[in-house]
Amino acid sequence: MTPIPSFAEAVPVWARIGCLSFGGPAAQIALMQREIVDQRRWVSDKRFLHALNFCMLLPGPEAMQLAAYLGWLMHGVKGGVVAGLFFILPGAAVMLALSFIYAAFGNVPLIAALFFGLKCAVLILVVEALLRVARRALKGAVPWVLAGAAFLALFVFGLPFPVVVLAAALIGFAWPDAFAKGGHGGAGTEGNSALDAMLAADPGRIASMAPLARRAGLVALALWVWPVALLMPVGGVFADIAWFFSKMSVVTFGGAYAVLVYVAQEAVEHYRWLSASEMLAGLGLAETTPGPLILVLQFVGFLAGWREGGGAWGAVAGSALTLWVTFLPCFAWIFLGAPYVERLHDVARLKGALAAVTAAVVGVMANLALWFG
């Protein structure tokens, strides 16, 4: 059996995953499963799926949080931090460069034509994602009704996205049997992985890692809150960025496509940082870079800083601030929740809440496709 890798051996693997994680969460999760489970047998299929279900319950990009959680399982807090950062930073660097090109040359005919083609491709990707999620989530009459209700709530009544997500979660929590067939399923196989062998030899390992994980989670929360607290009394575009994307970090259930509805309601229609067409271009850029699709938020923060914060330096500051308040909470949720994951494995009501949110996301994505179109 392959032994658990050393931290130094794991780092290049996380870097490789971060640089190759194109194609959205489904492709990214498949890449991680191939690298970590199938090829190296560091983690068993069952534990991988268990970890994925936990990350699906959290706000934020599930693929990035899955990498951070698996890194924590193998090497503690430093493993989680490195795995999570490598999943974010390559794509963030590319997105920053592409954002500069868009802001500086987006009106040049050739560049404008390229971005128009990108927008058309993204519309197709949104529809494909809608159909894929619908096939997985809408199994039974109740999920279909909930998806339709979510669509009407947004398209007809204009309800805020967080209200729709919260209502769906409460319905699934109260009525888990109606959603038992939806969402991520499959128990997986235990297998003979390096991590399972290590945990069998040291049953108290996770419990011994818990105190440091909780401290790391609290530090991440503090680092997330302090710039918001400093900027809010000052006001201005950077205070708006800090506050808005901090709110986003606690309601980003259902993936990047679903979150774009909330971004559209606020960043486009309320703050007027960018247009719907530019939002579509930003999603296209996020689709073409490695890392989580939620990096589209970095593009929004970049344009807000570019237009209202003082040009290039304001754009860099807006981009960095957006990344800070978007991803620090992701690390906090992982480190605070990781020690308790095993207890969540068979909680039917939590699974019901997740499946109901996934069903509602179908309606949310249908609204998004019409809004972009």
Language model regions located:
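Multi-pass membrane proteins that catalyze or facilitate reactions on polyprenyl-/lipid-phosphate substrates
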Residues: 1-58, 69-289, 293-373
